[in-house]
Each structure stands twice: as C-alpha cells, then as structure tokens.
Amino acid sequence: MDQILVKAQTLIEALPYIQKFNNKKVVVKYGGSAMLDPELELNVIKDVVLLKLVGMQPIIVHGGGKEISKWVSLLGHESKFVDGLRVTDEVTMEVAEMVLGKVNKHLVQMVQQLGVKAVGISGKDGATLCCEKKLVNGEDIGFVGNISEVNTDLIDTLIKNDFIPIIAPIGLDKNYMAYNINADDAACAVSTAIGAEKLAFLTDIEGVYQNPEDKSTLISVLTLEKADELIQEGFIGGGMLPKLKNCIDAVRSGVSRVHILDGRREHCLLLEFFTNKGIGTAIINDDSILFEHESGMKEG
C-alpha cells in the first residue's frame, strides 16, 4: 500500500479517540528507563506535546529515583529501601529536592522547545500535595510522605492558562516540613483529584500478563474484577503489585482508564491512546463502555 495512504489511514484511525478525549485531562506518570535515554525522553515529551496540540489537557508527574540514588552515592551515602520506598533522612531529602527540581526544569525546557508552554512545580507550590509521615509496617522511614489531600487550585490555573503542569512529587505536612512522595502515589492522587479521564504509568514492562512467565499473555483490557482476581491468586508480584493497586484505586475513585505502558517503546502514549490495538494494559471499571474493537480484548 502507498506509504502516504498508510499515514492517512493512521490519522483516520486516531480521529474517534481525538474526538472522545478532546478537552479531557490526562495524567502521565513519567519514570523508569525512559527518563535515562535522551532519545526515549524526547519521544515521550513529543507524545505529551501532541496530546496537548490535539485538544487534550496533559499533566506530567515525574519521578527521578535512579538519579537520586546516583547523587546519594556520590555524597558517600547508601540508598536504602523498605518495601520499595526510599528511606529518606535529612541528607537524602535535600538530595531528592535538588535532583527532582533539576529534572523538573529539564522537562519544562524540553516541552517549551517544542512550542508548548509548561510550568514546573513541586507539590510544595500552592500546597498542592499535602501529606503526613508514612509508616511502613509501623517503621519510621524518615521524610517519606503519604498524601492526605491534593489542592488542585494551582494545577487548574495552569491548565486554564494553556500551560502543561509538570509536577515533582514533594509534599508538605501540616508543619510545612517537606516530604518525599512516591511518584506513582502522587500521580494516582493527582489524577483522582483533578477528575482525569486517563492516567498512564510509563514503566519498564509492557503491561499486565495473565501469566507473568509467558510474554504472549499480555492483557489489553483488564477489569477491576479480573485485576483483583490476579492479585488474590498470586499472579502479580514485585514492583507490579503496588502499581496495579494504585491503578485499581484510581479507577475506583473515578478515573475512567488507567494504562500501564512500556516507556521504552517509541511513542508509547500515541500508540496506546490513538490506535485500535494499543500496546499496553488498560485497567477499566467492570461496567465501562468499551470501544467497538475491544469486545474481544477484555479480561474480566
């Protein structure tokens, strides 16, 4: 088939999705290996900019864990984790704020180089992310926060003024102390608070598998009932377990669809949002209305 015609058909395939998600808020949790490769990083930012230009309202919540670990090590400290959460003493907290601030402004610069306005904030700005100390099995792991409230005023103002908000996951407690917040938790809380249509987690895995040992069992559309079943039967473990629980919480709190995508895949957001087949796993409510082509892809 003529290559130009193929490109035209790709645009036509995207049309119903562009129409459906026009003016809808979409939260992208950006992290993993896609942050470490400049080419992948540019692809992700191009995708986010295109979402904005076709009428969606993207918000980026980013991590920076690997970069934080690097700088903690350079300062002669050791990174420690409990249940996947970074033990954060005063030195580590200072490093986290420094590194996340650097990452944040770098992402702002990349977006603006592509002709779209962006503003980088941390959860401290406008008291956007209010938190309390997080305990893990009763253990104090330092300045690690559990989000208690999301104040959306600043985010809403930025969106209304045509900016892409880019949020670093640092929060404040009631005494105005800064806390490091897990970026997945922050993305989930933000998407719920702003009434997002979609939340996309960029990870280092394709999505959720029916059988983790068999990569051909990727689930394209996963209902909450089936997700709960996979967890209860022990099919979900490791880092995917808290991530899938976050997805379930977000959908139960009103987010229409939560996507788990391989951020190492070129233009993963566009392929998931604007093509019939998609490339990752979409978690939906049990009674969600499916697109016509999805009826045979649903698990649950």
Swiss-Prot record:
Cited NCBIfam families: argB (TIGR00761)
Subcellular localization, as worded in the UniProt entry: Cytoplasm
Catalytic activity: N-acetyl-L-glutamate + ATP = N-acetyl-L-glutamyl 5-phosphate + ADP
Enzyme class, spelled out: transferase
One Pfam entry name: AA_kinase
Family: Belongs to the acetylglutamate kinase family. ArgB subfamily.
Name listed for the protein in its UniProt record: Acetylglutamate kinase
Keyword annotations: Amino-acid biosynthesis, Arginine biosynthesis, ATP-binding, Cytoplasm, Kinase, Nucleotide-binding, Transferase
EC number: 2.7.2.8
Function per UniProt: Catalyzes the ATP-dependent phosphorylation of N-acetyl-L-glutamate.
Biochemical pathway: Amino-acid biosynthesis; L-arginine biosynthesis; N(2)-acetyl-L-ornithine from L-glutamate: step 2/4
Gene from which the chain derives: argB
The keyword Amino-acid biosynthesis is annotated on this UniProt entry: yes
UniProt binding sites for substrate: G64, G65, R86, N180
One GO cellular component term noted in the UniProt record for this chain: cytoplasm
InterPro entries for the chain: AceGlu_kinase-like_sf, AcgluKinase_fam, ArgB, Asp/Glu/Uridylate_kinase, Glu/AcGlu_kinase, NAGK-C
Coiled coil residues, start to end: none
Site location (Transition state stabilizer): K29, K243
Species this protein is from: Lachnoclostridium phytofermentans (strain ATCC 700394 / DSM 18823 / ISDg)
Signal peptide (UniProt feature, chain positions): none
SUPFAM superfamilies, per the entry: Carbamate kinase-like (SSF53633)
Cross-referenced PANTHER family: N-ACETYLGLUTAMATE SYNTHASE, N-ACETYLGLUTAMATE SYNTHASE, MITOCHONDRIAL
GO molecular function: acetylglutamate kinase activity; ATP binding
Lineage: superkingdom: Bacteria
